[in-house]
């Protein structure tokens, strides 16, 4: 007997930049494993975030540290319906909409017009542990002419989903480092939406080393000419870990620039009973018909260090106009280049040290772009700690 399933028709859209969006979780179908947006992740590992069967909801634990040399930075805990939340756009998937619907409050960090804030403001989200599910919303606004650095850190254990938005005003500059430094039993799904004004600059870095399942979905929208977005990422997955990065850069106006570079590594232990390490990177860049003068490039590189680990990489570039400066994309998944190891060995460097140098050099292309010395050093140390597991 053939079983026929009745499926609600998808909301029509022309491009990935026009996906159906809503703040109401009930407007989304429950994801299925064969859905394009969810086909790589194991829905069983999401602890009910995707279908509403999660542990009791609770407010997220958020602390904000503003340094003394910040010229004009403020933090407010606001009501869930505060008008400053959600300005960058509505969720485009059910988990993000669940986080929006279930949150009890939000956090708003504002950098005033023309202010100079050279030291990072640190936002720390701490997991609430077992038996509950935390939901949150964070809005970071850099007003016109201001510059700011934000370190967004996730630590501890638990199940967490949130919406984070970045409003970057005209001639403003924001550098943000998202560091998912969870314990290895955490599950975290995050939507991160950025809205850039005229001649605005965003430097967005995601570092993913901790957590059991971590899915980060950054989306960038240019609203006026002259915008510049650099999207960087580093990740290192071990047995039992699944990391997914799924991003979109939407060039909807003329004369904007974007550069995307993510690098990751995976390793495992043949004696482990945990699932093999797995990562997924999906990078979408959309150049709309009126986005003349666009200059964009995206790349993902993954190193598989042991048998069994798996990395998926899918770059997508959609171009609706030929009047651009340049556009390109690339993705590679590979192992050590033995020729590089032999080259270093020929110069007296032992094989294990040679491999360590190659991997650290691989990551340094991204890590060295982080403008905060302490964060850059911490990320480099984490790579070294991961390699120590392999005896490198």
Give, region by region, the residue ranges found by the protein language model.
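N-terminal amphipathic, basic helical "cap/leader" segment at the start of enzyme domains
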Residues: 1-101, 105-107, 112-113, 117, ...
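Conserved beta-strand/loop scaffold segments within soluble protein domains that form the structured core
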Residues: 86-349, 363, 367-392
């Amino acid at each position: 007997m053939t079983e026929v399933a009745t499926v609600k028709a998808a909301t029509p859209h022309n491009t990935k930049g026009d996906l159906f969006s809503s703040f109401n979780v009930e407007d989304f179908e429950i994801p299925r494993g064969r859905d394009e947006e969810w086909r790589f992740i194991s829905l069983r590992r999401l602890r009910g975030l995707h279908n509403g069967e999660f542990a009791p909801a609770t407010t997220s634990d958020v602390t904000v540290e503003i340094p003394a040399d910040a010229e004009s930075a403020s933090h407010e805990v606001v009501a869930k319906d505060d008008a400053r939340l959600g300005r960058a756009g509505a969720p485009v998937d059910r988990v993000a909409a669940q986080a929006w619907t279930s949150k009890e409050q939000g956090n708003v960090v504002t950098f005033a017009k023309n202010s100079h804030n050279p030291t990072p403001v640190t936002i720390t989200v701490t997991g609430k542990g077992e038996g509950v599910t935390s939901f949150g919303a964070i809005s970071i606004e850099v007003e016109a002419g201001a510059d700011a650095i934000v370190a967004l850190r996730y630590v501890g254990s638990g199940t967490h989903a949130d919406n984070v938005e970045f409003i970057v005003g005209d001639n403003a500059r924001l550098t943000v480092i998202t560091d998912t430094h969870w314990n290895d039993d955490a599950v975290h799904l995050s939507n991160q939406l950025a809205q850039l004004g005229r001649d605005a600059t965003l430097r967005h870095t995601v570092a993913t080393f901790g957590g059991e399942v971590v899915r980060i979905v950054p989306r960038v929208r240019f609203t006026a000419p002259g915008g510049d977005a650099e999207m960087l990422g580093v990740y290192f997955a071990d047995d039992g870990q699944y990391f997914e990065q799924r991003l979109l850069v939407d060039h909807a106006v003329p004369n904007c620039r974007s550069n995307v570079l993510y690098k990751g590594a995976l390793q495992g232990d043949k004696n482990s009973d945990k699932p093999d390490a797995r990562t997924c990177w999906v990078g979408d860049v959309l150049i709309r018909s009126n986005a003349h003068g666009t200059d964009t490039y995206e790349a993902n590189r993954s190193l598989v260090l042991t048998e069994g680990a798996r990395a998926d990489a899918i770059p997508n570039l959609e171009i609706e106009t030929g009047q651009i400066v340049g556009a390109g994309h690339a993705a590679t998944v590979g192992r050590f280049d033995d020729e590089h190891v032999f080259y270093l060995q020929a110069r007296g460097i032992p094989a294990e040290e040679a491999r360590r140098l190659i991997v650290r050099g691989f990551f340094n292309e991204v890590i060295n772009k982080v403008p905060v010395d302490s964060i850059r050093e911490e990320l480099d140390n984490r790579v070294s700690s991961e390699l120590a597991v392999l005896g490198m």
